[in-house]
């Protein structure tokens, strides 16, 4: 039997040239051959200034680790289905993006997922991090999963909570230990007593099942973009919220609000405040507080005491009537 090629004994430049040609999964496998391999590979990969990726991990029944960069898309999914084990797909798109998808068999998918997660975090440079935590899966290991994430990711750009099982404690534990910096997405069931406690302002908060979100919590939400469905906020409370906004008492940084109207028959209660109905033929141009230029057609204007304009639209989304408000400054 021939001896394996002594790859690690190559000069630095030659080794780097070979590693550049290797796919992410090949690099991961190579790092697992020895501790020396991992140390050298970690040093070489992290020295590449341009090799920065976006990481997405999830904890569904078949947990996944995905990362992608300017020319690479890598996706590894763990499965307990032997028929799908060791399945792989690789192709190069016309735009030069290299797609590399792997299905790995495991008797304990979440433990092997956690092992790979640690290896990936050690080897590669990530400039953005996203986490989807499924509250229905691996309930006995949820704290261990979150603790691992905390050890590797003290902060994430995006966090999505998914699930039908009420798991307030898991959500609270995650948010207490891992800082979400941009986007918090609730696609999960929470109890009526759940209290969201945020210490920092976010780019966006989205709530799909807002049974827990009352007027007091709405006032305290800290985000530029707020989407809420399924809340119990009344039209009277919505009117009070808009009046508080007009008086600069809450949400001075908000750019967009979308919220369900619970009683469409009395939606006029919401607009029991100074407002102006803009003809639908009128198109206006303005700039949001995120410095985005927008064009608006029609709508219902309300004014804040500092001159900012909030334009309100009512629209049907499925079987729900939604109030949308976009905040901007009109061009003179």
Please annotate each region the language model reported.
Residues 1-332:
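Non-core capping and flanking segments associated with repeat-based/extracellular domains
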